[in-house]
Amino acid sequence: MKHAVVIGSGPNGLAAAVKLAREGVHVTVHEARDTIGGGCRTAELTLPGFRHDICAAVLPLARRSPAFRGLDIAWIDPPIPAAHALDGDAVTLERGLQETADGLGADAQTYRALVEPFVRAWPKRWSRWDLLRLRPSLVRGLLSARAIARLFETERAGALFAGNAAHSVLPLERAASAGFGLTLCAAAHVDGWAFPRGGSQALVDALAARLVELGGEIVTSSRVDELPRADAVLCDVAPSEFARLARLPRYALGFRHGPAAFKLDWALDAPIPWRSEVLRRTATVHLGGTFAEIAASERAPWEGRGPGARPFVLVVQQSLFDDSRAPAGKHTAWAYCHVPNRWDGDATDAIEGQVERFAPGFRELVLARNVMRPRDFEEYNANDVGGDIVGGANTLWQLAARPRLRPLPWRTPLPNVYLCSASTPPGGGVHGLCGLAAARVALRDLR
């Protein structure tokens, strides 16, 4: 029997391990920390009984991913996938494409024309090479978010799109930022923005259980300092860490990490008191106001500036729909903004000020908070280099050359050694596809 070693137990590493085990390979996973999960861990970060997702929280790309097919996970679907707060109003990303379009007034037809091709093509959009075969309507994803926003007449449509495009962690004037916005809008219409009951940890726990069922093993508190001997070695690590393990100092030269996250978790005495009632019907709320406000916020970390008074903030409030997250009558919330890589400032007031802007009285409900700065993210997960939680800057070049421009970028210069982290295609997000792709290449080479 062939033997494979996987370094790292995040969703990509475990997805790779499960694929290999299904094909009859004996797999050992090594995890440096004492718990598995990578970017999908859940813990009591504030007060006893309040369970918070340490990194990933809502997983719009996970449920239909072939990497997670057949797992026993209880998914929760809020009535509205996501919403965007405006001063005195809000705009919603509904489950239905037409429902969303209907809320955009004069931009209904434009929104539908932009997003519907992505909805129709969704099952085919798991390979980075699909862009070579896409219809012109889908190639719009290579444009900047600003270019797409110019097609809208209303502030509501521009703001809704900006909030989704900001997940790219790119300036909204940069090429390919539109693709992230269009993809996430389409995800809402294809399958909602769901999350696992109990926390994102449930996803990796299900992957781990499947691996053990298939005869694999997981060793925690097992830091790897040199590449082990095996028929195949798959590394769910950052390119710089792979360069260290492989003793290839030039391997990661030129690979760039993007801005970092600054995150707060709150234990709350009551739900967030949103001024707009519709924001209480979703788990995901984008705070940032207009397109212009969000564009300015997302430009700042690329220019080395910390957040201003009104940063773009992503808020997740799972306890409205998942009573396992907090004691009876209490609630949790999770929020982050983008800051420069390795930034050592404090964005607490800026983030809480944005929440207060749209939910007056919020601060009075905070029982306890947990703060995660860029250095905390990297300490928690070595793949989050400098606090970058998406595996590397999502520039147009690095979407193609991730981490290097090669026909099969999961292969490394070493035989039978592969990279399977979010620093390989198709990139960041909880979908397991980086690991699945690397495992498929490894299986081909093992035959």
Predicted regions and their residues:
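Mid-domain catalytic core of redox enzymes
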Residues: 216, 220-326
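Helical element adjacent to the flavin cofactor pocket in flavoenzyme catalytic cores
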Residues: 183-224
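A conserved FAD-binding loop/helix module that cradles the flavin
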Residues: 56, 420-443
